Amino acid sequence: MPDPATYRPAPGSIPVEPGVYRFRDPHGRVIYVGKAKSLRSRLNSYFADISGLAPRTRQMVMTASSVEWTVVGTEVEALQLEYNWIKEFDPRFNIRYRDDKSYPVLAVTLNEEYPRLKVYRGPRRKGVRYFGPYSHAWAIRETVDLLTRVFPARTCSNGVFKRHSQIDRPCLLGYIDKCSAPCVGRVSAEQHRQIVQDFCDFLAGKTDRLIREMEQQMTAAAEDLDFERAARLRDNIGAMRRAMEKQTVVLGDGTDADVVAFADDELEAAVQVFHVRGGRVRGQRGWVIEKSGEPGESTLEYLVEQFLTQFYGDQAELGGASDAGGDEASNPVPKQVLVPVLPETTDELETWLSQLRGSRVALRVPQRGDKRALAETVKRNAEGALNQHKLKRAGDFTARSAALQSIQENLGLQDAPLRIECIDISHVQGTDVVASLVVFEDGLPRKSDYRHFAIREAAGDGRSDDVASIAEVTRRRFHRHLRDMQEPGEMVAEGRSRRFAYPPNLFVVDGGAPQVNAAQAVLDDLGISDVAVIGLAKRLEEVWVPNLDGTAPDPIIFPRNSDGLYLLQRVRDEAHRFAISYHRSKRSKRMTASALDSVRGLGEHRRKALVTHFGSLARLKQATVEEITEVPGIGAATARAVLDALGIEAPPEPGAEAPPDSGAAAAVMGNDQSRVPG
């Protein structure tokens, strides 16, 4: 592997101007392309501290054997050159928004004498109008099948068209009136082209005019007593309305825009794009990409910039030869692109996109109204796509087996870790400190073995020590394991579960070297030597192993796209989720505790009944004993105890001896009353 010092540029030789650079491997292949406002500052960052780079970036620098750069005049030129080089060289270390398939579009061949409708994939061609993309080819066929009863345009291939012209007999679609049969002269070329033009107008959003014209024709046919034609027009209008229902209006102002949203984690990011034309969603696309791991290249701003550059660069190339005819629905670059955040290069991106479009393009972050609501919908789609991607990868048996084998090989374990346990600590400024323990067996969660822990020794009075908390939870978990192993007969007799009798093959803690060393020290004290311990740091691919001799070893680096790292990520995330849920529950219980908690015999159910009956504690304080006893399950004694707990003096029970001062007050009151004139 090349040494970066052998190809590092000489000091002062790198220009400070903006430009684009590329790293090459020993075989001369380009492995990474980047751009920078200052080439010197950016390139020096790759060589200043190799150990401080993200693992993926460090691997790139160690793989490369040379670096070269090109100075440009503006950042717009840098954007264009970066895109061209990524497209040309396909560097392995760059983020690429590759499709796992080619998305289909609906093509209308206006360049033919008798235009036809067809499903199409590939580069755009001159004289052809395109609608889409669609997520599935069947969605195009369904739309065409619905609309050809209204607009009976040709859908057959050139060979089929020629054959039916020779035999002078239309195909089945011609017989059922879903094709105007220009092949046998049922309509002229001009009439058929008008049918196709109306079809295109409908898909382009000019629906109101077409429906209004058909309604006028239907009314005229009815007045002429041509009820058969009126019924056919009525059915056609219904078919058009059903087609419109499939594309619900999402932006009432008829906006043409692409709405982009992201969902990401430490390793990957999912992006979704909704194509809105004429206020309706005309298409949708999605990708899941691997993140580089470099902090500056994992931000949402960077992901947005890279996506806009690559996606619209590719779209412009596909649409470069097409004849949009000024039609907004066919233009690959819309007037607006709605994004979650604006990158630093927003001005340059707008200029570049405007050049691709041929008119102004605006990047916007939706703040309110329909656009904001649609952006949230697209984001939910991105989150769902990322979750589905992760579940699909984790749920596959082959992938799970590969993940366990990957962990075994990378950690040097004797056997595959069939049982993995992970602990995580959760608290807010030292209060309500709790821990979770989750269990995965054969790569799948075993939720019946999950456990919560309330931290006792390492927390309290607003203090929290994560390292000590890790040690406490580890001690309690494995102390229970040893006890269950020593008392199997008693445990079975009492009917208790043997959940803690099974030790994990791999014990994972959330943290770095201090946390993992604390857990290992506890296992050593307990004499447990057959459990491997690791720690997961914030950089997920850095896996820490115990080292109790005081030195600071380098972490084990997992490949970012390995199945083993995916499984460890799922285990860590599940432990974090479980700890957070318990912490929130405990904090909520503490914060909502009231004076009613101290009333003996008043359980949670009756406390809720009291608050529900009176609406609030304030109204409960104003209630009398008799009013409180109206609540089911509350007696007079409990009602008095409730008032006492709320600081309200309750009247004495009937027959009880009144205090002396109370009696004197009553006598005075009686004397006063006796002197009131009758």
Curated annotation (Swiss-Prot):
SMART domains: GIYc, HhH1. InterPro entries: GIY-YIG_endonuc (IPR000305), GIY-YIG_endonuc_sf (IPR035901), GIY-YIG_UvrC_Cho (IPR047296), Hlx-hairpin-Hlx_DNA-bd_motif (IPR003583), RuvA_2-like (IPR010994), UVR_dom (IPR001943), UVR_dom_sf (IPR036876), UvrABC_protein_C (IPR050066). Residues 208-243 form the UVR domain. It is found in: Cytoplasm. Residues 16-95 form the GIY-YIG domain. GO terms for biological process: nucleotide-excision repair; SOS response. GO terms for cellular component: cytoplasm; excinuclease repair complex. Pfam families: GIY-YIG, HHH_5, UVR, UvrC_RNaseH, UvrC_RNaseH_dom. GO terms for molecular function: DNA binding; excinuclease ABC activity. Residues 649-667 have a biased composition (Low complexity). Gene3D superfamilies: 5' to 3' exonuclease, C-terminal subdomain, GIY-YIG endonuclease, UVR domain, UvrC, RNAse H endonuclease domain. Keywords: Cytoplasm, DNA damage, DNA excision, DNA repair, Excision nuclease, SOS response. It comes from the Bacteria. Residues 649-678 are annotated as: Disordered. PROSITE patterns: GIY_YIG (PS50164), UVR (PS50151), UVRC (PS50165). NCBIfam families: PRK00558.1-5, uvrC. Interacts with UvrB in an incision complex. PANTHER family: UVRABC SYSTEM PROTEIN C, UVRC/OXIDOREDUCTASE. The UvrABC repair system catalyzes the recognition and processing of DNA lesions. UvrC both incises the 5' and 3' sides of the lesion. The N-terminal half is responsible for the 3' incision and the C-terminal half is responsible for the 5' incision. Belongs to the UvrC family. This is UvrABC system protein C. It comes from Mycolicibacterium gilvum (strain PYR-GCK) (Mycobacterium gilvum (strain PYR-GCK)). The lineage of its organism: Bacteria, Bacillati, Actinomycetota, Actinomycetes, Mycobacteriales. The gene is uvrC.
